[in-house]
Design a protein with these regions (language model features):
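Conserved structural core of kinase catalytic domains
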Residues: 260-294
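A conserved alpha-helical element in kinase catalytic cores
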Residues: 231-264, 293
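Mobile active-site "lid"/loop adjacent to the S-adenosyl-L-methionine
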Residues: 93-119
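C-lobe/activation-segment region of protein kinase-like
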Residues: 329-397
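Conserved SAM/SAH cofactor-binding pocket of Class I
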Residues: 6-83, 88-91, 97-98
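Protein kinase catalytic-loop region centered on the HRD/HxD motif
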Residues: 303-311
Length: 397
């Protein structure tokens, strides 16, 4: 069990002032933070949890001895047994980088010191009330920049409440709350929001959306779908990138193309998550006939884009722009660079891509006559004859 030290005292000062509502003390140890919260008139029920059985037994004995009310001590690994949402979540995690020769869960937070904190931030929004706050302590030894990166990636915001410097480290206490964006996303019934990937202009998050909450019905059936959330990167200089992509998704969705747009606001858009493999990964796992069918289908989608007079701009190198789903259907994603043009080149660009992956296709017993393909691409560019696409598919041998 972790006995109170300087870090515990520093955090306790803030807990005694700021704890309110339903309180969760994670990694309670001696129970110093839970007891401090209990002493605040603004606090209601206090739940103290720890992975250490001895710590929970000792705290329960203290609760009985003092005949304390409105406090429970439970064994839990982070949020494992912490049900419901909380107005205040307190966490003084083990924050030292792992010492290879010593195993002590009470002081070591992982290889670099921040891994346990990363798990915490990935889960905390599901347990924090919309107006809730996190009181979080960490050390300079943990890497302050990394902690702030984890906070930001999870769409949270922070402010410094207190700090204390020692000869070998500096301690910080942060108040962390949900960002306005996160609160708005959760108000839209998006749950389990997690960072997924970073693009040139946007950041992608995944979430689960309970559509039954969005439609008034007499039936209680829960229909959850996996969704992707795209928000503009804070460091991106692109103007109106969200509005631009929403515009084109509306257009291509009418043709059965692109991920299905669900809803949007000025600074984010939400669409159905496309589960599957990127095109080259998929090709490596498939047979010759399946690959031909997919290439034909993609050329068909490119033809639709050309017919609409729009250019996706990425089809000559669409490694991250085409996903093949589990039922072997190609889906074009990421329309943020799409432009309107009287000279669309989606078909010709994708034919060029086919020529460039000659070795990957050859490994699957599929040969493409590059000279003939490029000749057909030029003919299509000059004439717009859609029959040329059939000839392009037939040029594989």
């Amino acid at each position: 069990m972790y006995e109170p030290r300087e870090d515990s005292i520093l955090l306790e000062k803030q807990v005694s002032k700021l704890a309110f509502g339903r309180v969760l003390d994670l990694g309670t140890g001696s129970g110093i933070q839970a007891l401090a919260a209990l002493g605040n008139h603004d606090a209601g029920e206090v739940i103290a949890v720890d992975i250490d059985d001895e710590a929970i037994i000792a705290l329960n004995d203290l609760i009985k001895l003092r005949k304390l009310r409105k406090i429970k001590a439970l064994r839990s690994n982070l949020f494992e047994n912490a049900d419901g949402k909380f107005n205040t979540i307190i966490f003084n995690p083990p924050y030292l980088p792992q010492d290879k020769n010593i195993e002590d869960k009470a002081i070591y937070g992982g290889k670099h010191g921040w891994e346990l904190s990363e798990q915490f931030f990935n889960q905390v929004s599901q347990h924090l009330a919309a107006d809730g706050r996190i009181l979080f302590l960490f050390s300079s030894l943990t890497n302050r920049a990394k902690i702030e990166e984890l906070i930001n990636l999870n769409l949270l915001q922070f402010r410094l409440l207190g700090q204390q410097k020692f000869s070998f480290e500096e301690l910080y206490v942060y108040e962390i709350t949900k960002s306005d964006l996160l609160r708005r996303l959760e108000a839209r019934q998006l749950e389990q929001i997690h960072y997924f990937a970073k693009g040139q202009r946007g950041m992608i998050y995944t979430a689960w959306l309970d559509q039954s909450k969005l439609v008034k019905t007499h039936f209680a059936a829960k229909k959850q779908i996996k969704a992707a959330i795209k928000i503009k990167r804070p460091d991106s200089k692109a103007q109106q990138s969200i509005e631009h992509e929403v515009h084109w998704l509306k257009i291509v969705n009418k043709q059965g193309l692109g991920p299905k747009l669900l809803f949007y606001e000025e600074d984010f858009l939400v669409y159905e998550f496309v589960e599957g493999l990127f095109i080259l990964e998929w090709i490596k796992l498939q047979d010759r006939s399946s690959i031909i069918l997919i290439l034909k289908s993609i050329l068909g989608q490119c033809l639709i884009l050309d017919t609409l007079g729009i250019n996706k701009e990425e089809m000559h190198h669409p490694l991250k722009h085409i996903i093949i789903t589990k039922d072997n259907k190609p889906a074009l994603i990421d329309f943020e660079r799409t432009v309107e043009t009287n000279k669309p080149k989606n078909v010709t660009q994708f034919i060029e891509f086919i020529c460039r992956i000659e070795e990957e296709l050859k490994a699957k017993g599929l040969k493409a006559d590059k000279a003939r393909l490029r000749e057909l691409a030029k003919e299509y560019k000059d004439s717009g004859d859609q029959q040329i696409i059939k000839e392009a598919v037939n040029s594989f041998y």
